[in-house]
From Swiss-Prot:
<feature type="transmembrane region" description="Helical">
    <location>
        <begin position="142"/>
        <end position="162"/>
    </location>
</feature>
<feature type="transmembrane region" description="Helical">
    <location>
        <begin position="572"/>
        <end position="592"/>
    </location>
</feature>
<feature type="transmembrane region" description="Helical">
    <location>
        <begin position="682"/>
        <end position="702"/>
    </location>
</feature>
<dbReference type="GO" id="GO:0016758">
    <property type="term" value="F:hexosyltransferase activity"/>
</dbReference>
<keyword id="KW-1003">Cell membrane</keyword>
<comment type="pathway">
    <text>Glycan metabolism; osmoregulated periplasmic glucan (OPG) biosynthesis.</text>
</comment>
<dbReference type="InterPro" id="IPR001173">
    <property type="entry name" value="Glyco_trans_2-like"/>
</dbReference>
<dbReference type="InterPro" id="IPR029044">
    <property type="entry name" value="Nucleotide-diphossugar_trans"/>
</dbReference>
<protein>
    <recommendedName>
        <fullName>Glucans biosynthesis glucosyltransferase H</fullName>
        <ecNumber>2.4.1.-</ecNumber>
    </recommendedName>
</protein>
<feature type="transmembrane region" description="Helical">
    <location>
        <begin position="606"/>
        <end position="626"/>
    </location>
</feature>
<dbReference type="GO" id="GO:0009250">
    <property type="term" value="P:glucan biosynthetic process"/>
</dbReference>
<dbReference type="GO" id="GO:0005886">
    <property type="term" value="C:plasma membrane"/>
</dbReference>
<dbReference type="InterPro" id="IPR023725">
    <property type="entry name" value="Glucans_biosynth_gluTrFase_H"/>
</dbReference>
<feature type="transmembrane region" description="Helical">
    <location>
        <begin position="196"/>
        <end position="216"/>
    </location>
</feature>
<dbReference type="InterPro" id="IPR050321">
    <property type="entry name" value="Glycosyltr_2/OpgH_subfam"/>
</dbReference>
<keyword id="KW-0812">Transmembrane</keyword>
<keyword id="KW-0328">Glycosyltransferase</keyword>
Length: 857
């Protein structure tokens, strides 16, 4: 029970955490109880303990900064008269209705045959005729012909390499008349070879697509004569019309708060420097369900608004019902505020964009009224581990070729990657809301990889989707180590497999059907490659352990010898190597031609390329095994979660590497031993695969070290232009990240309950504005009582979230913790603030170091 009338020694400690003047603190120190303290803060001497602490939220929040918040018109009251911060603009709802998916072709055909029309689709516009559409279709037919032709030739060579030439010597009548074992012995080698040949054709066609994409990107970038690039449609200096309002939205969920708000601040300041700030608003859309992180987000939002004078321009909202993950978060924004903006730029938690880039995107949208989405090509930067720096180098050197190549083949029917892109709001709201996939199981429910689907729906609705591959000023970060990358890949794998259910949905453009197919192949190629290697090993075992059948026809006069053509094997191997590695060589040639200084010079960039090629060869089999596991997990319905421990230096501990890579190492050893037993000479061909698996543990650990990454940077290895001449936005992001980490708020939920100002901020930003109905009051009392009884460590997540979202319950818990001197809460709070920059403004009272006692006790 609350004992507010006794005078606690901790009253001075409470006042020490309010930014009061000496006179104000001395005056309030004379209060005889917490009730009187809150009454005097609220200027309401008649208020009871619970009412007084609620009424004091405003003074506790604004003390020392009232003018700042009032000038920005940030203070308001809710329907119950409680003070609240205007952390988001007024809601003006827009109708957002997702169209149900009709994924079953047979049902659609049956309904048509029985005269039952399918449900009408929302009206869609036709993309106006344009020359680029005809050119794009011709280019894609050429690409298809090149891929198929190249695959047929390679398949013919592969067929000649295999020892058993065709099924013509297999007699069906003889098979039906002989024993099952004899049939298996006779057919098995041919079945293996046929399976290997089919898998080879699929994989070679996949490699061929990447090769031709990179080659055309190389020619586009080398000549600079791309008359269809969308960035050429704007002069780049046109004034932005007042009605072209753009919302920058950053959906986040349990992210690194210092880094998120550092990037947001750098982007905001760059937009302000461009002179177009009045055309942009910024929204942080949080789906965070970790209460400590949620409170840190609140404080970070307040800090960044103060530091940039961004009140009324930078907004924050945390959803309490996390429906449909990221796509649901964007739907919620569109429903509440989307009608107020003409365009929306979606940022990732690690995105940074320059003001000029953002302004250029708006100008391009204005100049191209048929464009629905314009995607930039984000440049990876900002990480220092050896693994991340090699990946940054690879994406920065090779990535532009593939991005330009994608644009060459797709033109205005291209990709959207979910971030660092501008979207036209009206068609997005009308056509791109995502309904859950029908049915049950792992591939039903909320869509995980929303970006490809939204691009397909935008094009289906008659709007273009473009890649502005040459637009500078768009940045992102990559995972710091292999295991973090694989954790991300598991989500993407499941999402891309789900998206393939939309392959036959009515109205999808063929290009986006191909995008769904390539999304699947990005991960399905791994188990296909693994199966190819397993079958090749099985064929080796067959040739080694089974006696060859030289006479398989009645009255056969001459033996049927297995055939080997090593010259064809060498030719095919050389061709495959060219397809895999020529794009990397072309990338370096392009850098030589354009200027290699920003990459460390010609020698260093070439050496970096060779080292990266070796590293990618080491990691390819490791990724193959993991991606195979991810695909199997998705089909078996295993949950797509992977909880990695926190790593301050972003490095991988040996224990985690052994746990994650141990099975691969054992597989590599066993596989190598089997092949060595079957045919030691074949081990040389398999060595790159099994050797990589055996070395996966040390490679994963060593490549995650920041020290090695910085040492390589000092030697100008894996250098990228953003490290050679760092843009101002990235410099600012790095500076603000370090500052934010220094001022990071720890134990946020405890701070929101105990700390006077943090509690006031949390109450003013709480989103649940319930009334005083009896059931609600009973639930509040139950939650507060439970929190007082079990303390912060005993509270479950749902109770924490409910308390943080309810300003009434949070103020009552705050009052009771201090009035009853609840050690479980106050001791954790004291420990949290000892080394925290958000420390008391005055030294703690000596008596407050231990358990507070009542005055006169």
């Amino acid at each position: 029970m609350s004992n507010s009338n006794a005078r606690p020694v901790s009253l001075g400690e409470y006042l020490a955490h309010l930014p009061l003047s000496d006179e104000q603190r001395a005056e309030l120190a004379s209060c005889s109880s917490f009730s009187e303290l809150h009454q005097r803060l609220a200027a309401d001497p008649a208020a009871g303990p619970a009412e007084a602490v609620q009424a004091s939220v405003g003074p506790r929040l604004t003390v020392g900064s009232a003018a700042e918040l009032e000038d920005a018109e940030m203070l308001g009251v809710d329907g119950s008269g409680r003070l609240c911060l205007k952390i988001a603009p007024p809601i003006k709802r827009t109708k957002v209705v997702p169209e149900p998916w009709r994924t079953n072709v047979l049902i659609r055909m049956w309904r048509r045959m029985t005269g039952r029309p399918n449900a009408p689709q929302p009206p869609k516009r036709e993309l106006p005729p344009a020359r680029w559409r005809t050119v794009g279709s011709i280019r894609r037919y050429i690409l298809l012909a090149l891929m198929i032709g190249q695959t047929i030739v390679a398949g013919w060579y592969m067929k000649g390499i295999l020892p058993y030439q065709g099924w013509s010597f297999v007699d069906l009548d003889e098979i039906l008349s002989q024993s099952l074992w004899d049939t298996v012995v006779q057919v098995w080698p041919y079945a293996l070879q046929t399976s290997i040949l089919i898998l080879f054709g699929i994989l070679f066609c996949w490699v061929s697509a990447g090769f031709w994409t990179a080659l055309m990107g190389f020619l586009e970038l080398l000549t600079g004569r791309d008359k269809y690039k969308i960035s050429g449609s704007s002069a780049g200096n046109e004034p932005i019309a007042p009605e072209a309002r753009t919302a920058l939205v950053m959906p986040i969920c349990n992210e690194d708060v210092p880094r998120v708000f550092a990037g947001l601040r750098a982007t905001f300041e760059s937009v302000a420097a461009s002179g177009n700030l009045d055309r942009f608003d910024f929204f942080v859309l949080s789906d965070t369900n970790d209460t400590d992180i949620a409170v840190a987000e609140q404080q970070a939002w307040l800090d960044v608004c103060r530091e940039t004078k961004g009140f009324g321009r930078i907004f924050y909202r945390r959803r309490r019902r996390r429906v449909k993950r990221k796509s649901g978060n964007l739907d919620d924004f569109c429903r509440r505020w989307g009608g107020e903006y003409k365009y929306m730029v979606v940022l990732d938690a690690d995105s940074v964009m320059s003001g000029e880039c953002l302004s250029s995107l708006v100008r391009l949208m204005e100049a191209n009224p048929d464009a629905g989405i314009i995607q930039t090509g984000p440049k990876a930067s900002g990480m220092d581990t050896l693994y991340a720096r090699m990946q940054q180098f690879a994406t920065r050197v090779y990535g532009p070729l593939f991005t330009a190549g994608l644009h060459f083949w797709q033109l205005g029917e291209s990709h959207y990657w979910g971030h660092n892109a501008i979207i036209r709001m009206k068609p997005f709201i009308e056509h791109c809301a995502l309904a859950p996939l029908p049915g049950k199981g792992a591939f039903a429910g909320a869509i995980l990889s929303h970006d490809f689907v939204e691009a397909a729906l935008m094009r289906r609705a008659g709007w273009g989707v473009w890649i502005a591959y040459d637009l500078p000023g768009s940045y992102e970060e990559l995972p710091p180590n292999l295991l973090d990358e694989l954790k991300r890949d598991r989500r993407w794998c499941h999402g891309n497999l789900m998206n393939f259910r939309l392959f036959l949905v009515k109205g999808m453009h063929p290009v986006h059907r191909a995008v769904f197919l390539t999304g699947v192949m990005s991960y399905l190629s791994a188990p296909l490659w693994f199966l190819f290697l397993v079958l090749s090993t099985a064929l080796l075992a067959t040739n080694t352990l089974m006696e060859p059948q030289y006479f398989i026809e009645p009255y056969q006069l001459y033996p049927l010898w297995p055939q080997w053509h090593p010259e064809k094997a060498v030719a095919l191997f050389s061709t495959t190597i060219v397809l895999l590695f020529l794009p990397k060589l072309l990338s370096v040639i392009l850098i030589w031609a354009k200027g290699a200084v920003e990459f460390g010079g010609r020698i260093k960039v070439t050496l970096s390329m060779l080292m990266e090629m070796l590293f990618s060869m080491l990691l390819a089999p490791v990724r193959m095994i993991f991606h195979t596991r991810f695909v199997l997990a998705a089909f078996l319905g295993w949950a797509a979660t992977w909880n990695s421990p926190q790593r301050d230096d972003d490095s991988t501990p040996w224990s985690e590497a052994v746990r994650r890579h141990g099975p691969q190492t054992l597989l590599g050893i066993a596989w190598a031993a089997l092949v060595a037993w079957l045919n030691p000479s074949f081990l040389w061909w398999l060595a790159p695969i099994v050797g990589s698996l055996v070395l996966s543990i040390p490679v994963s650990v060593i490549s995650s070290r920041t020290r090695l990454g910085l040492a390589a940077k000092d030697e100008k290895l894996f250098l990228i232009p953003e490290e050679y001449a760092t843009p101002q936005e990235l410099l600012a992001t790095d500076q603000y990240t370090h500052e934010n980490r220094w001022h990071a708020l720890h134990d946020g939920f405890v701070r929101a309950v105990v700390d006077p100002r943090q509690n006031a901020l949390a109450c003013a930003m709480a989103t649940a504005r319930h009334g005083q109905a009896a059931p609600i009051e009973a639930l509040r009392a139950e939650r507060v009582a439970k929190a007082m009884e079990v303390g912060p460590k005993g509270l479950d997540l749902n109770t924490r979230l409910a308390l943080l979202s309810d300003p009434v319950a949070l103020t009552r818990l705050h009052e009771q913790v201090w009035a009853e001197h609840n050690a479980a809460w106050i001791d954790v709070w004291r420990a949290s603030i000892k080394n925290d920059p958000h420390s008391p403004l005055l030294p703690l009272h000596p008596e407050s170091e231990g358990q507070p006692v009542l005055a006169g006790a």
